[in-house]
Swiss-Prot record:
Binding-site residues, heme b b566: 97, 196
GO CC aspect terms: mitochondrial inner membrane; respiratory chain complex III
SUPFAM superfamilies assigned: a domain/subunit of cytochrome bc1 complex (Ubiquinol-cytochrome c reductase) (SSF81648), Transmembrane di-heme cytochromes (SSF81342)
Record: residues binding heme b b562: 182
Alphabetical list of Pfam families matching this protein: Cytochrom_B_C, Cytochrome_B
Listed GO biological process terms: mitochondrial electron transport, ubiquinol to cytochrome c
Keywords: Electron transport, Heme, Iron, Membrane, Metal-binding, Mitochondrion, Mitochondrion inner membrane, Respiratory chain, Transmembrane, Transmembrane helix, Transport, Ubiquinone
Name of the protein this chain belongs to: Cytochrome b
Length: 381
């Protein structure tokens, strides 16, 4: 009798995706993050679903409902801590996943890469609207500052901002619609993740060497299921350590105060995973220029496949490109640090220097390094 998983219409899809999938024999732990992101998404959806059962999206009761969840709902404190810190783990995995893609040249699978960038933008949108929901000071002012950026768009900006707000400022209508967006977006992310996998399985995975691995494939199960399980254990360990021992480590103390439109916090800043983009936004004195730089800092990922000049796919054997990659990483860490600092010297100039370096690194220096490495590897005799 033929194995049911190979014949049943539904099980067959699962089998071809997670069991009998031919995978390169040499993919490292950097290839674990896809499955970890899937787990993060499921954790966020499940904890979010239970939180939504007790949350009220009204300006008068939103803050109190979150306090009620933490105090009175069975394990409500745990749900909230897992949800808040799960978002941080989600973004850690996302950034590492994107970094892996850049380092090993995975972006040359253009469809998979472009869907991935759309996924990144969708997750960022979801996290932003989610941060507004507890209706603390930083929630309210973060929403006000970021949505207000839309007003920088010429001609239609103010109308657009008021349309998003549902009024003349961030208020009850804004909170209600943000809750609706925050509920629906994770399911859109799930659908996009399926499309992402669909495109990936059309070509098969890349591998650290960047060489076509078709001659040496192994089944996904048990080799990579057990490898992913190890990554999963480490992820859950980190998440639980964060959620149980220092749940407020990555949050903002201002968010423990209810939203007050009459009192502006001394330093408005988003969650840590948006700080790099926020630093780029702030480093440009012009409002519209800042908004364009903010968008460009993320959308630049879409043109990375067009900037690939090297004969080799991966950076594994390209030391100059490797050096530039790690300079880019250090640059992003610097921007993240600057985004969390007040707008004063020396932070202003450091932020401007880091922002100025970010774009030439990707647009000029890395493609030039690829060409230089091609020249160095050409036989000269």
């Amino acid at each position: 009798m033929i194995n049911m998983r190979k014949t049943h219409p539904l099980l067959k899809i699962i089998n071809h995706s997670f069991i009998d999938l031919p995978a390169p024999s040499n993919i490292s732990a950097w290839w674990n993050f896809g499955s970890l992101l899937g787990v993060c998404l499921m954790i966020q959806i499940l904890t979010g679903l239970f939180l939504a059962m007790h949350y009220t999206s009204d300006t008068l009761t939103a803050f109190s409902s979150v306090a009620h969840i933490c105090r009175d709902v069975n394990h409500g404190w745990l749900l909230r801590n897992l949800q808040a810190n799960g978002a941080s783990m989600f973004f850690m995995c996302l950034f590492l996943h994107v970094g892996r893609g850049i380092y090993y040249g995975s972006y040359l699978y253009k469809e998979t890469w472009n869907i991935g960038v759309i996924l990144l933008l969708t997750v960022m949108a979801t996290a932003f609207v989610g941060y507004v929901l507890p209706w603390g000071q930083m929630s309210f002012w973060g929403a006000t500052v970021i949505t207000n950026l839309l007003s920088a768009i010429p001609y239609i900006g103010t109308t657009l901002a008021e349309w998003i707000w549902g009024g003349f400022a961030v208020d009850k209508a804004t909170l209600t619609r943000f809750f609706a967006f925050h509920f629906i977006l994770p399911f859109i992310i799930m659908a996009l993740a399926v499309v992402h996998l669909l495109f990936l399985h059309e070509t098969g995975s890349n591998n650290p060497s960047g060489i076509n691995p078709d001659s040496d494939k192994i089944p996904f199960h048990p080799y990579y299921t057990i490898k992913d399980a190890l990554g999963l254990m480490l992820l859950l360990l980190m998440l639980l350590l964060l959620a149980l021992f220092s749940p407020d480590l990555l949050g903002d103390p201002d968010n423990f105060s209810p939203a007050n439109p009459l009192n502006t916090p001394p330093h408005i800043k988003p969650e840590w995973y948006f700080l790099f983009a926020y630093a780029i936004l702030r480093s440009i004195p012009n409002k519209l220029g800042g908004v364009l730089a903010l968008l460009a800092s993320i959308l630049i990922l879409l043109i990375i496949p067009l900037l690939h000049t090297a004969n080799q796919r991966s950076m594994m054997f390209r030391p100059i490109s490797q050096t530039l990659f790690w300079i880019l990483t250090a640059n992003l860490i610097t921007l993240t640090w600057i985004g969390g600092q007040p707008v004063e010297q020396p932070f202003i100039i450091i932020g401007q220097l880091a922002s100025t370096l970010y774009f030439p690194l990707i647009l000029i220096l890395m493609p030039s390094a690829g060409l230089l490495e091609n020249y160095m590897l050409e036989p000269k005799w």
